[in-house]
Amino acid sequence: MTTPHSIAESTDPEVFPANNRHLTVSYASRYPEYTRIPAITLKGQWLEDAGFTTGTQVDVRVMNGCIVLTAQQPQPEESELMQSLRQVSKLSARKQKQVQAFIDVMAGSK
């Protein structure tokens, strides 16, 4: 006989039926051969409601019979100082030393 601890409890589904969408795989033509390739089009206000606003980058994970789309978090903007440092790192070693000497003078360290 089964003990009470080994009986699975009923849980709510992670995705509610109202949030389900039904699509049909269509096709797109590939130029210049005009071969048909499978295509899925997603559109609707529900995408924005789900966190997929226009311009959002999306990670796509593909498994057999399953595609998972995940909205990427926007990258924080790089500060002006970090942008300048990135530019300096592309300069020649001589120019980098000149920039370092300037920073040292401004900081009063040398």
From Swiss-Prot:
GO terms for biological process: RNA metabolic process. The keyword DNA-binding applies. GO terms for molecular function: DNA binding; RNA binding; RNA endonuclease activity. InterPro entries: SpoVT-AbrB_dom (IPR007159), Toxin_SymE-like (IPR014944), TypeI_TA_SymE (IPR020883). It is found in: Cytoplasm. Residues 29-74 form the SpoVT-AbrB domain. GO terms for cellular component: cytoplasm. It comes from the Bacteria. The keyword Hydrolase applies. Its EC number is 3.1.-.-. Pfam families: SymE_toxin. Keywords: Cytoplasm, DNA-binding, Endonuclease, Hydrolase, Nuclease, RNA-binding. Belongs to the SymE family. Involved in the degradation and recycling of damaged RNA. It is itself a target for degradation by the ATP-dependent protease Lon. This is Endoribonuclease SymE. It comes from Salmonella paratyphi C (strain RKS4594). The gene is symE.
